Every structure is written in C-alpha cells, then in structure tokens.
Amino acid sequence: MDTLINELTLYAKIDTNRIPYNFAKINVGEYFNDCIEEIGLDLESKNIGLAYFNYTDGSTQIIADPEQLRRVIHNIIGNSIKYLDKQRGLINIRIKDVGDFIQVEIEDNGRGIAAADLPYIFDRFYRADASRNSATGGSGIGLSIVKKIIEDHGGKIWATSKESIGTVMYFVIRK
C-alpha cells in the first residue's frame, strides 16, 4: 500500500510539473556503467543474466536528470524481473547513438506482452494480465510514470514484444 501511495504521489507531482528536474550533461558511458554495476548485483542475486552493450563513443553526453533517468531504468528492469518466467532469465541492455539522441534498449526473455495489450502498457493503471497481477504486485502506473519522465526529457518510449519470447523497451534521450 505504501508503494502505491508513493507512486501516486510521484505521478501527481510529475503530472502537475511540481517535480523540479535537475538536468545536467551526463557522460553516457560512465552513467550507464554505474547503473549496470548496481543492477548487475541485484540480478545476480536473483539468478538472472545480464548483458550490456554500449555502442556509443566515450565522449557521448546526454542532457538528463540523473535521478529521474535512474528511476526509469529501475522501473523497466523491475518490470522485466516481475514477468520473467523462464528458468534462466536474461536481460540485455543496449545503448546506441542515433543522431541527436541516444537510444536505450532493455530486452528480456520473459513471457512477453500480447499484441492487443501492447498499445496500452503506458496508460495509467493499465495491467496487461490481471490474473497475474496479485502475485507480482505493482500499481499499474509505473510505466506511465516512466513515459512522463522520458517525455519531460524531450524523448519518447515504446515497446515491442512477442508472447513467450520476451519484450524490448526502447527509449530515446536527447544529447
């Protein structure tokens, strides 16, 4: 219940533009290396494999709020963990340079999302599989928070998925 209240409070603040973003130039390699190190320890303890590929050069920078970007990454990874149903879960993270943006791809080999549900996963309170929600927890607003943060950064977010194969979440952030 506390998590739901915290997420609703955060969403209300973001939605009414009451969260002051602290935008700064961030070195992509250094920032994501730190994130991967932190995430890797958690995934290792859960017996989930992690592969990380940074295809940007060492000097690539983005303009972002490091704390809010970390929230985005943790939320997406958290969802991947919740819906991994394979004996050996795997998460791949790829960072690519795409012109004026960097593109982040977070791929899992979980149960995937039905094509009918995919257009709605970023909507507030949307839950793709109600029968599994009570077991996995969550409020149904995590991805809508992620979308709002990415859009407030001048980026966009989308996903592709195949049932029983996995999901790839993509987002772009401006340089």
Where are the regions that the model predicts?
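Conserved glycine-rich
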Residues: G154-G155
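Short conserved segment of the HATPase_c
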Residues: I113-R127
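Short beta-strand/loop element within the Bergerat-fold HATPase_c
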Residues: L90-D100
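Short conserved segments within the C-terminal catalytic ATPase subdomain
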Residues: D42-Y52
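Conserved micro-motifs of the catalytic ATP-binding
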Residues: T16-Y21, Q61-A64
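Acidic ATP/Mg2+-coordinating residue in the GHKL
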Residues: D108
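A conserved beta-strand-to-alpha-helix junction within the catalytic ATP-binding
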Residues: N22-E37
